């Protein structure tokens, strides 16, 4: 899915699993609270400066999507020569402002269902700073727990 958009070549979409090992209670539920990840805390993946923030867009009922605001509520952190996008955040949850310094692990917001998404998840991707915006720049691979994520990889926290 992300391969069609070069800056998102290494993008990762995180979903949560409930106690039954599935993403949501029910089959394609419309209730956002049915999704295991909805409302989960989002933390800074790196220390740096917040360079972009958008908040106030509605959390949409699945499978509605906002194609005019693809990242929905989101923020961008500049760190270590990269721009890191954290997208589809919950309306009103963004806890930082543009220009604010953040530390790795600092709470930034909560997972929502805003933007061009069909169910709650956290989208993250990084581009090389100076090669364009977070939506047009040169994609950079991201490591999680020291490894490259692949489809259906499980990361426990």
Where do the language-model regions lie?
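Short, charged beta-turn/beta-strand-edge "cap" motif at the junction between a beta-strand
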Residues: 20, 56-58, 108-116
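Short, well-structured beta-strand-loop connectors
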Residues: 41-53, 95-111
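A residue-level detector for short acidic-glycine micro-motifs
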Residues: 16, 52, 88-91, 110-113, ...
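Histidine-centered divalent-metal-coordination microenvironment in nucleic-acid enzymes
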Residues: 117-127
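Short, glycine/small-residue-enriched coil/turn segments at secondary-structure junctions
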Residues: 1-65
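Residues that flank catalytic or metal-binding motifs in active/ligand-binding sites
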Residues: 8-10, 38, 46, 71-73, ...
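Zn2+-dependent peptidoglycan hydrolase active-site motif and core
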Residues: 36-37, 47-90, 95
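Acidic, glycine-rich catalytic/binding loops that coordinate metals and/or anionic ligands
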Residues: 2, 66-69, 95-103, 125-157
């Amino acid at each position: 899915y992300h391969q069609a958009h070069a800056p998102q070549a290494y993008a990762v979409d995180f979903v949560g699993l409930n106690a039954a090992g599935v993403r949501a209670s029910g089959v394609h539920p419309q209730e956002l609270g049915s999704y295991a990840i909805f409302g989960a805390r989002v933390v800074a993946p790196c220390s740096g400066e917040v360079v972009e923030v958008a908040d106030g867009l509605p959390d949409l009922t699945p499978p509605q999507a906002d194609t005019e605001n693809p990242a929905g509520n989101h923020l961008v952190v500049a760190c270590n020569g990269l721009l890191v996008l954290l997208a589809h955040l919950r309306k009103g949850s963004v806890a930082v402002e543009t220009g604010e310094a953040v530390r790795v692990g600092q709470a930034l917001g909560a997972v929502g269902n805003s933007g061009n998404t069909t169910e709650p998840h956290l989208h993250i991707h990084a581009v090389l700073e100076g090669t364009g915006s977070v939506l047009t720049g040169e994609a950079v691979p991201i490591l999680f727990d020291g490894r490259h994520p692949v489809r259906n990889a499980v990361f426990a926290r």
